[in-house]
Amino acid sequence: MISISLPVDKYRPSSLSSLLVEGLGAYPESVWLGSNYLCLFDSQNTVESLQPDFKTLMSLPDGLGVIVTAPSSKSEYDFVSRYFAPRIGIDEDHATGSAHCMLVPFWAKRLSRSKLDAFQASPRGGLFRGEVLGEKVRLRGNTEEFLKGTIRL
């Protein structure tokens, strides 16, 4: 298990654009904007069944990508999410720490808790334990090793 502390990604309410609805193929309950769009849906099933149009999402005027989230239907997690970022070459990321810098504070406020368990419902899946610590978010989770090496400076 690894742990990393990152700055909170501040967000503000945003209007629901037709491009966002078209790109996701569904209407979120509400939308916020920080470094990414954050779209709240009513159910885990809705989040898991989204089949985004990545070409349309690529044409959104703001944000690096789109985070979709909903309360978890399973007791072992507080919320679920997925992250789509075709503008930066990632249709769907498996486990996105930077997205959780927005998600953990968002859900902490909604649930009145500072420590949360999250599931990123990508095809591979990702588990996070997040904690809001002032202006930082501490994330813990297991990693998938993809590169090993030595750098000499």
State what each model feature region is:
Residues 1-153:
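Active-site proximal loop and beta-alpha junction motif in alpha/beta enzyme cores
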